[in-house]
Each structure stands twice: as structure tokens, then as C-alpha cells.
Amino acid sequence: MRLLLLVLAASSFLSNIVNAQSVPPKLKPNRVTLAGGNSFELYLPEYLTVSVAAEGLKRVRFMARSPDGRIFVTDMYNLADNTKGTVYILDEFDARNRRFNKVIPYLTGLRNPNSIAFHTDENGADWFYLALTDRLLRYKFTRGETKPNAEAQVLATFPDYGLGYKYGGWHLTRTIAIGTNNKLYISVGSSCNACEEKEEVRATIIEMDLDGRNQRHFARGLRNAVGLRWVEDRLYATNMGADHLGDARPADTMYRIIEGANYGWPYCYQSGAKVFRDMGFNSRGQKMNCRSVPLANAAFAAHSSPLGLEYFDSSQNNSLGGHFLVALHGSTKRSLKRGYRVVRIPRNAKSAAGEDFMMGFLDEGKVHGRPVDILRIAPDTFLLTDDRAGVIYSVYPK
């Protein structure tokens, strides 16, 4: 009897922990005023606040911390001219004012610089990786430098065209992640909204050695996996679904990537917690068995546009420990009110919709910003890029 009571008590205790962790955080307003005079409120869990760490940028995108502790960030400039991209160094962070005192151009004149990464090899040499639309580059990195001291090495080339935009078409971005297995992963989006591609590299994640050798397909059927993050021994990715199935379908998704898996595009798509056939390409299942498509860890509302993701292995008050934060860039159709926020996802979730963690970028039809990437600085502290306002926010405990 005593053993039974102990078991019941333990079960109740564990249940309370699970329930406590699953309660969505209560969000409180924080007033933000930008240099141009725009003033609005961003909503965060009540124990956090936000400040402007850097502003005056353009299409500021993805971040990485260098081996010497500085923050590097990409800036794609704008949608009309994709040849003026820049990589900046954010330096001399003022902890009192929560701002970077220096924003230094590191590389300029780049074609859609979206993603960067650093790696220190087994010989102690530091390397800087840069993903452009048409090329993956690597530079020997010297700590403390403000300009590259070495020539770029071209590790891979990619298609540089598409069916939509004037300067290269659909899905111009390439995103990098480096694993603890000393492999590099890079995502290449589709050339179209929905089609059967002529080039195998499209809608894939490619794995290669850190010097570019031994390239192979790691995963397929990912229409536009803009966010990549290696966590411990696994690769995670966000993915944007197609636009031709209406306002309610398909779900935008986040996956723990399985080596060799096909995630369905253009033949299958996820909506809610189920995978369906795209009737325009796979009406009878003749092209692909959609039952073989892995279910997502997170299934966001259609057209939310998930981009960057970051994992928090610990948190001072358990609101972030064991969770991802995912930046939902937002639908271009504002009336849908999809995205324009940061959401929280448990690491082992199954088709989770996400819990609101940071909101206020879309307010009564007015867009104040579009979240892109999240970089963890400390257990409850992170930087967030916004490519609409050209701002980098610092979020931290009060």
C-alpha cells in the first residue's frame, strides 16, 4: 500500500511538472522606440524585457558568434538589389545601455548573404563560412580582424536563377549549420512554388566535409528550409510550405531531420498532425507514398514563414529550458495575422502549434517588424534580428 501511495505521489508530481511546463507564458508589454520615432509595444514573458541593441541596418538576417566572442550578422540590403549585401561585426556591447557601440562592415558587395558560421578545426585554425545565393565560401579567420586577411575559398556552387524575382527567382537564400560530427549542412530552396525540379540540389539539405569535399544529399523534399540548427547530435530545420493550397494549408513546419528522409514536397504536405497528397502532383499517390513522410516536430499555421530557430538547454525559471524559440517571419498577406512573432516549442514536441513567446510586430494591421533569427547569449538572454525595421533586439531578464 505504501509503495502504491509513493507511485501515485510521484506520478502526480511528474504530472504537475509537465502541466507547469506546458502552460503558455503570460506576456506583458514593453515599450520600444526606434531612432526614426516609431514607438510600439513588444510583448514578452513578464520576467523578460527588451531593448534595441543595434539599428539603422537594412535586411538584417542571421547571426553567429566568432571564436573571439564577437557577434557577426548578415544584411541582404533589400529585395530590389541583391548585390549590396554586407556582413557586419557587432562589437563593444554596452551592458548598461544594452547596445553595441560599434557596427563594423566586415564584407561588402555580396549577393544575398543570408547565413554565416564559424568553426575551429582540429589543428586550432579558425574558419569563417558564408552562404551566398550562388556560392558557399570559406575564409581563414584571424581573431580580432575587422576585414578578412585571407582569400575566399569556393566550397560549392548553387543555381542562381528562378521563376519569380527579377534578380534570381524563388528562394535566394542558403543557410549553413555545422555539426559536432565535423560536417557542414546547407539548405537550398526550390526554384518555384510547386513544381517537379530539374536539378537535384533544389529543395534539399546537402551534407559535406568542412572543406567542401564529399557532398551528398542529406534530406530531400524541403521546399524552403531557411532555418537550420545543430543541437547536440541532431540537425533541426524550419520549412515553408507551398502557397497554392489556400489560406489554411499547408502547415509551415519544423523538423528534427532524419538522414535520407524525403519530406514530401511537392507531392505531399502536412496540415495539422497529418500528411496529405497534393492533388495537383500526386492525386493517386502514384509519385510518392505520403505515409512515408515524417511528421513535423512543430506544425505552424499556414504561411507563418518560420525562419531562425534556437535551442535553450537551460533556463533560470524553466520557461526556456528544453525548448526551441522559432522566429515566425509572417505572411505577406497581413489580413491572415499569421506569424510576426516568436514562439516556443518543446524539443521533443510532435506537430506542436507553438506557444506565443514574443509578440507585437504586427498590431492592428501595422507591421513594426518581421523576426528572422535568434541567437542565445545566456540561459534567458538572446538577440533577435528584424529584417523589416533593420533592427537587432536584445531580450534579457529584468
Question: Where do the protein language model's features map onto the residues?
Answer:
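Beta-propeller domains
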Residues: 72-99, 144
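Surface loop/turn motifs at the tips and blade-to-blade linkers of beta-strand repeat domains
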Residues: 53-57, 105-111, 155-160, 164-168, ...
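Conserved beta-strand position repeated across blades of beta-propeller domains
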Residues: 54, 64, 117, 177, ...
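Beta-propeller domain segments
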Residues: 21-46, 173, 190-193, 203, ...
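Hydrophobic beta-strand segments that make up the repeating blades of beta-propeller
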Residues: 71-73, 126-130, 184-186, 235-237, ...
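Beta-rich catalytic cores
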Residues: 56-59, 83, 102, 109-112, ...
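Short loop/turn segments immediately following the C-termini of beta-strands
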Residues: 76-78, 131-135, 141, 189-191, ...
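Asp-box/WD-like beta-propeller blade repeats and closely related beta-sheet repeat scaffolds
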Residues: 101, 107-119, 132-178
